[in-house]
Amino acid sequence: MKLKVGVQLFSVMTELANDYLKTLENVAKAGYKYVEYVDVPGNSPEEIGNKVKELGLTAIASHVHFDPFTSTQEDMVKIVEDNVKMHSEAIILPMGIMTTMEEIKTVAAACNEMAALAKAHGMAFYYHNHCQEFYQVEGKTAYEWLVELTDPELVFFEVDTFWATRGGQKAVELIKKLGSRAKLIHQKDMGKSADPINLIEGVTDLTRENYCEKIFGRTNPTDICTVGTGIMDIPEIVKTVTELDYAPYIIVELDSCARQTEEEYNTPLSPLASIKASREYLESVIG
């Protein structure tokens, strides 16, 4: 199965906040047919869903405001119902902060519950990693515990290869280990400024209160760059995902990147130009 290139709309967050529907048009003009939602206040689910259909886009999934520690059953039902109206194929928990076994169990239980609800409405459920999940808790990483404690028939994983790398993992090995549960791939590229690459190494006494300072406080916007202009071995990732044949999409996500050009590091592209260049690069690698 040939990989399809999608885009996480967080990559154009400022544009979305200014005019969500116009930005969808511009994303389509940038050559994208597959999009992944990010939750932005403003337009109704119906308006967004109708626009996506009008443009002939496929809504791969949606990163949602779902907190495993505070979201109620009512909150979860609304999330699912809104995403049905948006024609989303899946719901994704963008990140979880788990630094103790009790917290891991809470996140796992919430994922199982949301996944069952999503399935009942014809949608899949995924967990998207950053790097803090690769902190060790009782002999394993929190991520390993999450994989073990979630229902393999309901909970799948969107592997963010950049953040996995910054968690001290080899992205291709993580994808291989997850096997058929790794059904979506997030791809950005790593700038030369990323130092240290492994943000977890040496971190101790991590908590839900201090994780942002201890981990993300050591990052820089230029750590993330346009796909194909950084130091990640993206052809190896594409080759691995293609050979395994579990994930139909590789999704560009550029976070708050400086979007450097290959020719002149630190010269930013606009977000729309950057996602276009990223798509073109990935499609050239996929062939």
Q: Could you say what each language-model-derived stretch is?
A:
Residues 25, 34, 41, 68-157, ...:
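Active-site acidic/histidine proton-transfer and metal-coordination neighborhood
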Residues 44-62, 121-123, 268:
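Short acidic, glycine/proline-enriched helix-loop-strand junctions
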Residues 36, 61, 92, 126, ...:
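Conserved beta-strand positions in the central sheet of alpha/beta enzyme cores
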Residues 13-18, 34-47, 65-74, 97-105, ...:
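Acidic-and-aromatic substrate-binding clefts and catalytic sites of carbohydrate-active enzymes
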Residues 1-28, 53, 82, 87, ...:
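Histidine-acidic metal/acid-base catalytic patches
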